[in-house]
Amino acid sequence: MKNLIKNIQNFAGRYGPWKKGDKIIAAVSGGPDSVCLLDVLVKLAPKYNFKLRVAHINYGLRGKDSNRDEKFVRELARRYGLEISVLSIAKNKIYENAKVFQLPPNPPFPKGENLENWLRKIRYDFFEKIRKKEKYDLIAVAHNQDDQAETVLMRILRGAGLQGLSSMKPKNNKIIRPLLNTGRKEILEYLKANKLKYRTDITNKDIKIFRNKIRHRLIPYLEKNYNPNIKKTLADMVLVIADDYDYLLANEERAIKRAGADINKKGGVILSAKKFQKLHPAVQRQCLRKIISQIKTDLTDIEAGHIEEIVKITASAKSKIQKAEFKGLKIKRKGDKVRIWIN
């Protein structure tokens, strides 16, 4: 499927996620998307002079299936002649090819978090540790156009702001997403044409899981009744939103200072209600999300309504003490001072 590889090259040319000679870690779960990603990177390596390495995480959440995934990815790396790093969360160990390193116990499960968010943090922390240790430039993950559409719908339904709607970019710091403009159907066709095997996670069919319900119920309904190209439409929209968000982001540090914010990760954040109210409403919301991100690991469960509740507290003319509490956060206003901290 030359068209898929050409599409990825064109996408990379537009958004510049990599440059010639880059050393790239490919995050491979063993599923169809990551197997496709690895094969494409291997085929592009001679042209771009890439040096590649595989990283895999065995969460141990699916018992023998998790171990079979790990075995499959190890064999895949061997066939491509690539080195591999494996994090086994169940055994609390990192495997660097033949070497084994005992890890300290994982940090305690933080308040206000859920399992999915915490595992995501462990995953990206591991990739970054390997990147720094092995002196690599980038980490390639296999998010595709379907993932982008599913994610934006999830976040719209949860009331996300610009940050939540624009977080999956072609490149976020050291994270690149070469497949972000490629649909799942194209990926499966590529795997079939190239006779590439992959692992299947049966939990992806469980519609009790929010993302799966959107994937198997909502998106097909929207495609049939409203827009047959809804996935591409949503994915393209996110790229536009990302540009708008980047503009706000460029000015957020200055805005936080103008709000008189004093950030202390342990004690939380204190800001001036009067100074905060002088900011443009769009900047206010962005400031609050940035401030909260300094004291809370993940903002996935922070909805637009939560942000608006804090804005209302800062704008209130009431003289009595005002309080709010949600998603592990506490907010308290006394006079001009508004304090935000982890419950």
Positions of the model-derived regions?
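A structural signal for well-ordered alpha-helical scaffolds and beta->alpha junctions
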Residues: 1, 5, 70, 180, ...
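ATP-dependent adenylation/nucleotidyltransferase module used to activate substrates
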Residues: 2-155, 185, 275
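AMP-forming adenylation/ATP pyrophosphatase catalytic core
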Residues: 4-33, 50-57, 89-91, 100, ...
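Short hydrophobic alpha-helical segments of the AMP-binding
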Residues: 41, 191, 334
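Non-catalytic, surface-exposed connector residues within folded enzymatic/regulatory domains
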Residues: 67, 208, 228-231, 300-304
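Catalytic subdomain that performs nucleotidyl-dependent activation
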Residues: 133, 138-142, 147-237, 241, ...
